[in-house]
Amino acid sequence: MFSVPFDNLVLYFCRKLILFLYSKAIYDGKRNLLIKRGEIIMSREYLKKLIMAALFAALACVATMIIKVPTPGTEGYINLGDAIVILCGVILGPVWGFLAAGIGSCLADLIGGYFVYVPITFVIKGLVALCAGLVYRAIGKTKTTRYAGVILGGVIDIILVAGGYFVCEYFIYGAGAAASIPGNIIQGIGGLVISAILYPALIAIPYIRNSSYGFEN
């Protein structure tokens, strides 16, 4: 039977995701390209957002799959993807962040064979990014409050991931789902710390800063 190395399979799916969104962006950009200068700029911004969303979706997928620690009592696992999920909402905004975080995270479950978690992960991780983006928009007016927005996004991640997965797993595994709560809390804390470290480094990159939610002109 034909087999593909696991790492190559992950890269293959991530590359396909980026190419799909990029080609869609080009198509939509050409379709929406109008004579007025303002509308042309909007099409370019739309293209830029799609490319950024594709990149962050791929990052979320890879980060989720780098390290997996199985959680007792369920078929789930602890991973490092939460940091990217938080940053999806902060950097891309609520809507694009929801899509990038949800798609990238559930793609990791799909590739890893955690099929029962695919829809659950899409909703929960998408909601984390959505809420993180909304909080960031509400308070991220200065450098200090932007950083506070990232921290609050991490707190949201801890609550939604630990609570959301417990509720969903309870209907699947029963009382054994409670065993995953400590692991999900640890995962959320790790996501908070890592996202707080990565945020200033990412924003320092001109392309990401100029494309980021909250830094738009």
Predicted segments — roles?
Residues P5-N217:
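Loop-helix junctions at membrane interfaces
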